[in-house]
Structure formats: structure tokens, C-alpha cells
């Protein structure tokens, strides 16, 4: 097939270390890309590109399985997951596997099974990747036309998009199936401190589900990150699953409209840029979810959120000083505001001190102590349960702090155990990777648009000093 880009521009980009190293269809002269450009050499070799993608999937699944078994091997049931640096077992626990009331791990065998299944799957994918990379046909169009494609074929591209959407939708519906019929999922809001619960009545109201989409991302609104009950979570997956399945079927059966054909760039690099942009957005959303949300990411497994840890400290000292005789309803702090309790801007009774900034935090261990107007003084005096005290004391000392500035009043101790919360790891990694993927999106989008417009801006390589230097070997 004729190349869709100019080879001339690439000839002077890179001098091969070994000019005699030639692999059919994968050398610099025939593809315009040097060895380090990776899959770019396979742009027009659909069979080999399939091998690269299957092998990549195998590597991903291998990591998941190996890391899963590593975490199982190192897991200590007596300590909370977030104290052990775990990031995979909390996800399995959130799905309701191996845990009971209060998030206590009662069986690690499901975690072992998960790891083994992923390892076996990775072996199958790895074999497929090696086969298609080395043995299988270089292009699929002739032998397997259903799996073959041409990047410019708009109808085929939207068919592939549709297949992907159907698979994503089925994945979302699998969670609905697990929550509704296959044992339930962990609900941190279950009475008494969380438990595995079958979600018998997921939210189906479009006003509620799409209301999250229409909310502001700022302040106390929080967009979709503000979801605070499992009914809405599972109902949202039901909606998104059905939309993806039916949207996928639509894209399989139809051809793109004229406005879509004109609006988009239809090339392999353009599709790469669209994908990178989408993954970037998902990375940023995941960052916010794991940092702020304690429903989808239960604190029993991931540790408390920052505001939750700050509120937990205020609660812990209120409990202590109340037992020592303090009148927590009227005691003044050093600023003249309430030391333990004060009023929010809208009149609710909230915790006093520096944690006042987090007055609208919601957490399962504190909600039972609220009344119609914020914290209930009578409940604080008479109804505090031991599990609430234990949990808040634990959360107070495991804040996801990694900042050099204010920490919401949480006491920091230079001699403390070196603790980094999984929330810190996961939110930071997803933010950083989301940013990198966004830059990659801009890079490939710019190249794709330039190529489509008939020009590619870049450094003039004809006078590159490197070209006149003696090769290192």
C-alpha cells in the first residue's frame, strides 16, 4: 500500500547504529522510521501491529497478575491495606471479594485466584503477541478481510470504534451484574461501618444520573466525583453500559455523517492522538476520584481522604477531652471561635479548629452523629460508638499528606512511621500520567493535522551537525 506520509523528511532524522540491520518492512529505508520509533514502523502492517498490541496487552495483564500475587504474598491481615502500600487488593476488596463487615479481610484465596487468572491470561496474550509479531501474516487485509483495515477507510474505522464501545459497555455491565446478582460489592455506607451488600435497587432515574454530569466541578459540587452512594454508582454503570453498547451498535451499522467526515482527520496518527486525549481526561478524572471520593474508593482499603483525616483528628480530640470533663459545646479555642464545635457559614454545627475548612466532609463514621442541623450535640454526648472512635483515631494518623504547606490542622510528627497513603500514590501517578498523555495528545494531533494539510513543520535536518560526524562504531 502506498505510504500516507513523506519518506523524505525522515531520512535525516536518525543514523542507524548498524546500517546493515534490516528486517523486512521494519527498517528505516522502507518505513521512514528508525528502530526507536517503535510501532510507527508498523503503521501499514496491520498483522504486525496486531502482534504489538496483543503483546502489549500481555505485558499489562502480566503486571496485574504478578503484582497481585506479590501483594497477596506480602499481605498481613492484622494491618489495614492502606498501611501496607497495596493498590490492587483494595480494588478487589471494593468489588466485595474476600472481605466482611468493616472491611475486614476474611479470605485471601479470591485474591490468589485473581492473580493466577491474570498470569494465565498474560501467557495466552504473550503467545499471541509473539505469533503475530514473528510468524503471522504481515497484513490482514488479504487473508482476514474482517480484521484488516485501511486508516483512511472511514466506515471501517467507525466499525472498529463501535466494537470497542460494545466491549467497554459490556465491561460496565459486568460491574452491574456483580453488584446485583453475583454477591454484591463493598459499601462503605452500610450500617455499622461498612459491609458487602447486594445493590438490589440501582438508580435508574436519568435526572439523577445525568445530574452528576451537569454539576459544576468546583467547590462543594464536585461533578461526577461527588457521587456518595452505591445505588448511584451501579446505576451510572448501568446507564453508561447500555449507552456504550447501543452507541457501539450504531457505529457498527452506520457510516459517518458528512460533518464528521469533514471535522476529523482520518489517519492512524490522528486516531492515536484522539485515544491519548481520552486517556488523559480519564487519568485526570481518576486522580480526582481517588483523592476526594470515599465511596468508590472506601477509606477502609485506601485510607482516609485528606479532609476525612483532618475531621477525624478533631473528632478524636473531642472524644478524649469530653471524657476528661470538657464541655465541648461551649469551650473556646485560642481564636475565640469554638475549640471543638462551631457554626458553618450556613448555620450547621461543625467541628472547630483548622478543620473548619472541611466542614462539608461526609464519612461513614461521622454521619450517624449528625442531626437536622449538622452535628448533634446530644448524640456527641451520648451515642458515640467504639468503632467510630477506633476508626477516627486510625484515620487521624494515616492522612494522605504529601504537602509542604498547610495540612488541615493534622498533627505531623517527624519521628512517625514513614507512611505514604495509596491515595497519594494513585492520585499523583494518575495526574502525572494524565499530563504526559495530554502532551502526547498535542504532539500527535499536531503531526496528524500537519500531515493532513500537506506539510510537516520540523527542524531542517539537511545541515544537522551530527550528519557530518564520524559514526561511533
From Swiss-Prot:
Q: Where in the cell is it found?
A: Plastid, Chloroplast thylakoid membrane
Q: Tell me which residues bear N-acetylthreonine.
A: 15
What is its membrane topology? Multi-pass membrane protein
Q: Which residues form the propeptide?
A: 1-14
Q: Give the primary localization class.
A: plastid
UniProt keyword list? Acetylation, Chlorophyll, Chloroplast, Chromophore, Manganese, Membrane, Metal-binding, Phosphoprotein, Photosynthesis, Photosystem II, Plastid, Thylakoid, Transmembrane, Transmembrane helix
The gene for this chain is: psbC
Concerning NCBIfam families, the annotation shows: psbC
Q: Which InterPro entries match?
A: PS_antenna-like, PS_II_antenna-like_sf, PSII_PsbC, PSII_PsbC_sf
Q: Specify whether Plastid is a keyword of the entry.
A: yes
| Assembly mode | PSII is composed of 1 copy each of membrane proteins PsbA, PsbB, PsbC, PsbD, PsbE, PsbF, PsbH, PsbI, PsbJ, PsbK, PsbL, PsbM, PsbT, PsbX, PsbY, PsbZ, Psb30/Ycf12, at least 3 peripheral proteins of the oxygen-evolving complex and a large number of cofactors. It forms dimeric complexes.
**In which residues is [CaMn4O5] cluster bound?**
367
Kindly give the SUPFAM superfamilies that the UniProt entry links to this protein: Photosystem II antenna protein-like
Per the UniProt record, the lineage of the source organism begins with: Eukaryota, Viridiplantae, Chlorophyta, Nephroselmidophyceae, Nephroselmidales
User: Could you list the residue ranges that cross the membrane?
Assistant: 69-93, 134-155, 178-200, 255-275, 291-312, 447-471
Q: Does the keyword Acetylation apply?
A: yes
Gene Ontology molecular functions = chlorophyll binding; electron transporter, transferring electrons within the cyclic electron transport pathway of photosynthesis activity; metal ion binding
Query: What is the designated name of this protein?
Result: Photosystem II CP43 reaction center protein
- GO CC, alphabetical: chloroplast thylakoid membrane; photosystem II
Source organism, top-level taxon = Eukaryota
Q: What does this protein do, in the record's words?
A: One of the components of the core complex of photosystem II (PSII). It binds chlorophyll and helps catalyze the primary light-induced photochemical processes of PSII. PSII is a light-driven water:plastoquinone oxidoreductase, using light energy to abstract electrons from H(2)O, generating O(2) and a proton gradient subsequently used for ATP formation.
Amino acid at each position: 500500500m502506498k505510504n500516507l506520509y513523506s519518506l523524505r523528511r525522515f531520512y535525516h532524522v536518525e543514523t542507524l547504529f548498524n546500517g546493515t540491520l534490516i528486517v523486512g518492512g521494519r527498517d528505516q529505508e522502507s518505513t521512514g522510521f528508525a528502530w526507536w520509533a517503535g510501532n510507527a514502523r508498523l503503521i501499514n502492517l496491520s498483522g504486525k501491529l496486531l502482534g504489538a498490541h496483543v503483546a502489549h496487552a500481555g505485558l499489562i495483564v502480566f503486571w496485574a497478575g504478578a503484582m497481585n500475587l506479590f501483594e497477596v504474598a506480602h499481605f498481613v491481615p492484622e494491618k489495614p491495606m492502606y498501611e501496607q502500600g497495596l493498590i490492587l487488593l483494595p480494588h478487589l476488596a471494593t468489588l466485595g471479594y474476600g472481605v466482611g463487615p468493616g472491611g475486614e479481610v476474611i479470605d485471601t484465596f479470591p485474591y490468589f485466584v485473581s492473580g493466577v487468572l491474570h498470569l494465565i491470561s498474560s501467557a495466552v496474550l504473550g503467545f499471541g503477541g509473539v505469533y503475530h509479531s514473528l510468524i503471522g501474516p504481515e497484513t490482514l487485509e488479504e487473508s482476514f478481510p474482517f480484521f484488516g483495515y485501511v486508516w483512511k477507510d472511514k466506515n471501517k474505522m467507525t466499525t472498529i470504534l463501535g466494537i470497542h464501545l460494545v466491549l467497554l459497555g459490556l465491561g460496565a455491565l459486568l460491574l452491574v451484574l456483580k453488584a446485583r446478582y453475583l454477591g454484591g460489592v463493598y459499601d462503605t455506607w452500610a450500617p455499622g461501618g461498612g459491609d458487602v451488600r447486594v445493590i438490589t435497587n440501582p438508580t435508574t432515574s436519568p435526572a439523577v444520573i445525568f445530574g452528576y454530569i451537569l454539576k459544576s466541578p468546583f467547590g462543594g459540587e464536585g461533578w461526577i466525583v461527588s457521587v456518595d452512594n452505591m445505588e448511584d454508582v451501579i446505576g451510572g454503570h448501568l446507564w453508561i453500559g447500555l449507552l456504550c453498547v447501543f452507541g457501539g451498535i450504531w457505529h457498527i451499522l452506520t457510516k459517518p455523517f458528512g460533518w464528521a467526515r469533514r471535522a476529523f482527520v482520518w489517519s492512524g496518527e490522528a486516531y492515536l492522538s484522539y485515544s491519548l486525549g481520552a486517556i488523559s481526561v480519564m487519568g485526570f478524572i481518576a486522580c480526582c476520584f481517588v483523592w476526594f471520593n470515599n465511596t468508590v474508593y472506601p477509606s477502609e482499603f485506601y485510607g482516609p481522604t485528606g479532609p476525612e483525616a483532618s475531621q477525624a483528628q478533631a473528632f478524636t480530640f473531642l472524644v478524649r477531652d469530653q471524657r476528661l470533663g470538657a464541655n465541648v459545646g461551649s469551650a473556646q479555642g485560642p481564636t475565640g471561635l469554638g475549640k471543638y464545635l462551631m457554626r458553618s457559614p450556613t448555620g450547621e454545627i461543625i467541628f472547630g479548629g483548622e478543620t473548619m475548612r472541611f466542614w462539608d466532609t461526609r464519612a461513614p463514621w461521622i454521619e450517624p452523629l449528625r442531626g437536622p442541623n449538622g452535628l448533634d450535640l446530644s448524640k456527641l454526648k451520648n451515642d458515640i460508638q467504639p468503632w467510630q472512635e477506633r476508626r477516627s483515631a486510625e484515620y487521624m494518623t494515616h492522612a494522605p499528606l504529601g504537602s509542604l504547606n498547610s495540612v488541615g490542622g493534622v498533627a505531623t510528627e517527624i519521628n512517625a512511621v514513614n507512611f505514604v497513603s495509596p491515595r497519594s500514590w494513585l492520585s499523583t501517578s494518575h495526574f502525572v500520567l494524565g499530563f504526559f498523555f495530554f502532551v502526547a495528545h498535542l504532539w500527535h494531533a499536531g503531526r496528524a493535522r500537519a500531515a493532513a494539510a500537506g506539510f510537516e513543520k520540523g527542524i531542517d535536518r539537511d545541515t544537522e551537525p551530527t550528519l557530518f560526524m564520524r559514526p561511533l562504531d
